[in-house]
């Protein structure tokens, strides 16, 4: 098997040291790891073979900067470490492919569904997979109707923005506890 060079972004993420260890100790081939992060001193900086400080994934030149790093380091596979960059990467899929880099991401439609909680719930429900009860909200009136539909104020209601990652945008509205 040929040796590989893998680029891993978000080198300061808690899971990245374990992922790097898996790449390095894979038992099949030599894997050279290039790390990038928007912090100058991410936790995995000294575990990687090369490191680059990059702007946030939302920066307009982010993909161009990563393309340059991939060319310079002869990257074979780009393994995104943070979901914030995936949407931008899939839009530049062909640019990475053109320089021989495989993006370790799903196609743009799958990314769109996975990054949108409402679309995910709708797709799962259409496939017959049980999902929690939900009510899509787009306006203040939708919000009021949705709260009533979900049983508020007798029952607490959980809100989640459709495009937030992790626990961003999660709110619990409980008439017995909420001051708002």
Question: Predicted segment positions?
Answer:
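ATP-binding N-terminal substructure of ATP-dependent carboxylate-amine bond-forming enzymes
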Residues: 1-105, 141
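Mixed-charge, polar/low-complexity N-terminal
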Residues: 27, 32-33, 110, 116-118
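Active-site nucleotide/adenylate-binding loops and adjacent lid/helix of ATP-dependent enzymes
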Residues: 111-180
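A short, histidine- and acid-enriched strand-loop-helix "catalytic/donor-clamping" loop
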Residues: 105-111
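Histidine-centered beta-alpha loop that forms part of the nucleotide-sugar donor binding/catalytic region
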Residues: 83, 108, 162
């Amino acid at each position: 098997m040929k040796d590989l060079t893998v680029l891993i972004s978000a080198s300061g993420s808690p899971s990245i040291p374990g992922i790097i260890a898996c790449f390095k100790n894979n038992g099949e081939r030599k894997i050279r790891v290039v790390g990038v992060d928007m912090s100058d001193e991410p936790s995995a900086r000294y575990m990687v073979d090369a490191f680059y400080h990059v702007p946030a994934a939302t920066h307009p030149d982010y993909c161009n900067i990563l393309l340059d790093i991939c060319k310079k380091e002869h990257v074979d596979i780009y393994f995104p470490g943070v979901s914030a960059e995936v949407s931008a990467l899939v839009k530049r899929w062909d640019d990475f492919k053109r320089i021989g880099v495989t993006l370790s991401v799903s196609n743009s439609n799958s990314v769109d569904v996975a990054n949108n909680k409402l679309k995910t719930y709708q797709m799962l429900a259409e496939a017959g997979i049980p999902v929690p009860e939900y009510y899509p909200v787009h306006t203040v009136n939708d919000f009021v109707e949705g709260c009533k539909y979900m049983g508020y104020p007798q029952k607490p209601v959980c809100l989640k923005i459709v495009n937030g990652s992790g626990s961003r945008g999660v709110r619990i509205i409980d008439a017995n506890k909420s001051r708002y």
